Design a protein with these regions (language model features):
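Short amphipathic alpha-helical segments, especially helix-boundary/capping motifs
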Residues: 96-100, 255-260, 282-285
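Short linear motifs at secondary-structure transitions and domain/linker junctions
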Residues: 85-91, 143-154, 268-272, 294-300
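Extended, folded domain segments that form the structural surfaces/walls around functional sites
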Residues: 27-30, 34-37, 220-226, 304
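Extended, H/D-rich, highly charged conserved domains that either
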Residues: 108-261
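Gly/serine-rich nucleotide phosphate-binding loop at the start of the catalytic core
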Residues: 1-143, 166-169, 174-177, 183
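SIR2/sirtuin-family catalytic core signature
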Residues: 1-17, 23-27, 110, 227-250, ...
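Active-site-proximal helix-loop elements at catalytic-domain edges
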Residues: 75-82, 250-269
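A Trp-anchored, charged/polar loop motif used as the substrate-binding/catalytic surface
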Residues: 1-3, 93-99, 151-160, 271-282
Length: 305
C-alpha cells in the first residue's frame, strides 16, 4: 500500500486500532510464558487441589503484578524506558488527532476507536495534559461509573464570536480485557484511585521470600525463565515452611482487579461478563461498519483466541 492509498483510507474510513502489550514496551513487560503457566496450573488445580498449587498461583500472579501492574504507580514512572514508551503513545495521539482534524468528509465522525487488550494506564498517562479528548467510558466526576453508551457520544465545540459549531476529534479507549484501575461496586464498574494499595499491603505483610521466583539467576546475572515443573518444585519447598492459607488474602485482593487474566480460557471469561461482552460486541460492530479499517500495533496473535 502506498501513501496515496493510505491517505484515501484515512479520509474515507472508520478508523480502528487494536493495541497489544508490545506497544507498552520497553517500559512494561509482555506476557511471556505467564499465559502458558497459568493455563497449565488451572488444569492441575481443576483435576486435584494441593496446597502447592495455591502457592504457585500466588507466585505467578505476583510476577504478573510486579512486571505489568505495579510499574503503573505514580512513583514508579521514571527512567528512559518509561519516557520512550510514553513518547510513543503521545506521538500516536498527536498524529491521529491532527489527521482527524484535517478530514474533509462531513459524513464520518471525527472519532477513532482504540481497542486494547492492555490493562495498563500508559495511554491515559500519555494523554494527560495534552488537550486531547480521550473517552475512557466513564461518566460522572465524584464516583465515575463505566458505561459503554459513552462511546456513542460526539463532542462539539462552539466558537466564541460567531457561534460556529464543529466536531472535535475524540479517541475512544475500549479496554476489552479490563483495566487495573477498574473496581466492582453494586454491579457497576467504578473508577478506582487506590487500585494498588491493598495488594501492596498484602505483599509487604508476606515478604518476597514467600513467593516462588519465576526466574533462574545465572552466575553472570542473566535471567532465564523457570519451567512449570521448576515453579511447582519451588512451591513444594515453600509448602514446608508456610501454610497455603497464608496466601489467601493476597490472592483475594489480586482478584479484585477487573481484568481478564492471561490464560487460554480468557476468551470464555470475557464473554461471560456483561461489560466485557459489551466491549467485544462494540469491537465486532466497529469492524462490521462499511469502510472500516483496523490498524494492529504491538499485537502478536500468539495466543489461542
Amino acid at each position: 500500500m502506498n501513501i496515496k492509498e493510505l491517505t484515501y483510507y484515512i479520509q474515507s474510513a472508520n478508523i480502528n486500532f487494536l493495541i497489544g502489550s508490545g506497544a507498552s514496551r520497553p517500559y512494561l513487560a509482555t506476557l511471556g510464558s505467564i499465559e502458558k503457566l497459568l493455563t497449565r496450573l488451572n488444569d492441575d488445580m481443576t483435576s486435584h487441589f494441593e496446597p502447592k498449587y495455591k502457592i504457585a498461583e500466588a507466585s505467578i500472579y505476583k510476577a504478573f503484578y510486579d512486571s505489568v501492574i505495579a510499574p503503573n504507580r505514580l512513583y514508579h514512572k521514571s527512567g528512559d524506558d518509561y519516557s520512550e514508551t510514553k513518547k510513543n503513545y503521545q506521538n500516536y495521539l498527536i498524529t491521529w488527532n491532527s489527521l482527524l482534524n484535517k478530514r474533509h468528509s462531513r459524513i464520518l465522525k471525527k472519532q477513532l476507536n482504540t481497542f486494547t487488550t492492555n490493562i495498563d494506564l500508559m495511554i491515559e498517562d500519555a494523554a494527560n495534559g495534552m488537550g486531547i479528548e480521550l473517552n475512557d467510558g466513564f461518566r460522572g466526576s465524584i464516583n465515575p461509573i463505566y458505561d459503554e453508551a459513552n462511546f456513542m457520544k460526539s463532542i462539539m465545540q462552539t466558537s466564541i464570536h460567531f457561534q460556529h459549531t464543529s466536531e472535535i476529534p475524540v479517541f475512544n479507549l475500549l479496554k476489552i480485557h479490563g483495566s487495573i484501575n477498574w473496581s466492582g461496586y453494586n454491579n457497576h464498574i467504578v473508577h478506582e484511585r487506590f487500585w494498588s494499595y491493598y495488594v501492596d499491603e498484602e505483599i509487604k505483610k508476606m515478604g518476597d521470600d514467600r513467593f516462588v521466583n519465576l526466574f533462574n539467576i545465572g552466575s553472570d546475572g542473566r535471567k532465564t525463565e523457570k519451567t512449570y515443573e521448576q515453579i511447582i518444585e519451588g512451591a513444594e519447598e515453600l509448602e514446608l515452611l508456610y501454610e497455603a492459607s497464608e496466601y489467601d488474602a493476597f490472592i483475594t485482593e489480586y482478584k479484585k482487579f477487573i481484568i481478564v487474566n492471561p490464560t487460554k480460557r480468557k476468551f470464555a471469561e470475557t464473554v461471560l461478563d456483561y461489560h466485557f461482552y459489551e466491549l467485544m460486541r462494540l469491537y465486532s460492530n466497529a469492524l462490521e461498519k462499511e469502510n472500516s479499517v483496523l490498524f494492529v500495533v504491538g499485537f502478536s496473535f500468539a495466543d489461542e483466541h
